[in-house]
Protein backbone atom coordinates (compact mmCIF):
# COMPACT_ATOMS: atom_id res chain seq x y z
CA UNK A 1 0.00 0.00 0.00
CA UNK A 2 1.40 3.38 -0.95
CA UNK A 3 1.52 6.54 1.11
CA UNK A 4 -0.42 9.47 -0.42
CA UNK A 5 1.72 12.23 -1.91
CA UNK A 6 2.98 14.68 0.70
CA UNK A 7 2.33 12.31 3.60
CA UNK A 8 4.72 10.14 5.61
CA UNK A 9 4.25 7.09 7.77
CA UNK A 10 5.30 7.73 11.37
CA UNK A 11 4.52 5.80 14.57
CA UNK A 12 1.70 3.74 13.01
CA UNK A 13 0.02 6.81 11.48
CA UNK A 14 -0.01 8.86 8.29
CA UNK A 15 1.26 12.35 9.11
CA UNK A 16 1.42 15.62 7.24
CA UNK A 17 2.11 19.20 8.27
CA UNK A 18 0.38 22.05 6.52
CA UNK A 19 1.49 25.69 6.70
CA UNK A 20 -1.42 28.05 6.02
CA UNK A 21 -1.28 31.78 5.28
CA UNK A 22 -2.88 32.89 8.56
CA UNK A 23 -4.41 31.61 11.79
CA UNK A 24 -7.98 32.08 10.45
CA UNK A 25 -7.00 30.10 7.33
CA UNK A 26 -5.64 27.31 9.54
CA UNK A 27 -8.90 27.19 11.49
CA UNK A 28 -10.94 27.09 8.26
CA UNK A 29 -8.77 24.21 7.03
CA UNK A 30 -9.40 22.33 10.28
CA UNK A 31 -13.14 23.00 9.91
CA UNK A 32 -13.07 21.41 6.46
CA UNK A 33 -11.23 18.39 7.84
CA UNK A 34 -13.79 18.17 10.66
CA UNK A 35 -16.65 18.15 8.14
CA UNK A 36 -14.95 15.37 6.18
CA UNK A 37 -14.22 13.38 9.34
CA UNK A 38 -17.80 13.68 10.59
CA UNK A 39 -19.23 12.64 7.22
CA UNK A 40 -17.10 9.46 7.28
CA UNK A 41 -17.20 8.87 11.06
CA UNK A 42 -13.41 8.56 11.05
CA UNK A 43 -11.47 11.23 12.92
CA UNK A 44 -7.81 12.31 12.78
CA UNK A 45 -5.59 13.67 15.50
CA UNK A 46 -5.07 17.37 14.83
CA UNK A 47 -2.48 19.75 16.23
CA UNK A 48 -2.90 23.49 15.56
CA UNK A 49 -0.01 25.84 16.20
CA UNK A 50 -0.73 29.29 14.80
CA UNK A 51 -0.56 28.79 11.00
CA UNK A 52 0.72 25.19 11.15
CA UNK A 53 -1.69 22.24 11.26
CA UNK A 54 -0.44 18.68 11.74
CA UNK A 55 -2.85 15.91 10.72
CA UNK A 56 -2.42 12.28 11.83
CA UNK A 57 -4.61 9.50 10.45
CA UNK A 58 -4.59 6.03 12.00
CA UNK A 59 -7.06 3.35 13.03
CA UNK A 60 -6.54 2.60 16.69
CA UNK A 61 -8.63 -0.58 16.60
CA UNK A 62 -6.38 -1.94 13.81
CA UNK A 63 -3.20 -0.85 15.54
CA UNK A 64 -1.99 1.34 12.70
CA UNK A 65 -2.66 2.57 9.19
CA UNK A 66 -5.45 1.07 7.10
CA UNK A 67 -6.66 1.67 3.56
CA UNK A 68 -9.35 3.91 5.05
CA UNK A 69 -6.63 6.12 6.56
CA UNK A 70 -4.89 6.34 3.18
CA UNK A 71 -8.16 7.41 1.57
CA UNK A 72 -8.84 9.99 4.27
CA UNK A 73 -5.30 11.38 3.96
CA UNK A 74 -5.74 11.81 0.21
CA UNK A 75 -9.12 13.46 0.77
CA UNK A 76 -7.64 15.75 3.45
CA UNK A 77 -5.28 17.18 0.85
CA UNK A 78 -8.34 18.27 -1.15
CA UNK A 79 -9.50 20.33 1.88
CA UNK A 80 -6.44 22.57 1.65
CA UNK A 81 -7.26 26.21 0.95
CA UNK A 82 -6.22 27.49 -2.44
Identify the role of each PLM range.
Residues 22-23, 62:
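Helix N-cap motif at beta-to-alpha junctions
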Residues 1-13:
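Short aromatic-glycine-(Arg/Gly/Cys) micro-motifs in beta-strand/loop hairpins
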Residues 25-33:
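Short amphipathic alpha-helix segments
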Residues 27, 39-55:
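Amphipathic, hydrophobic secondary-structure cores in small proteins
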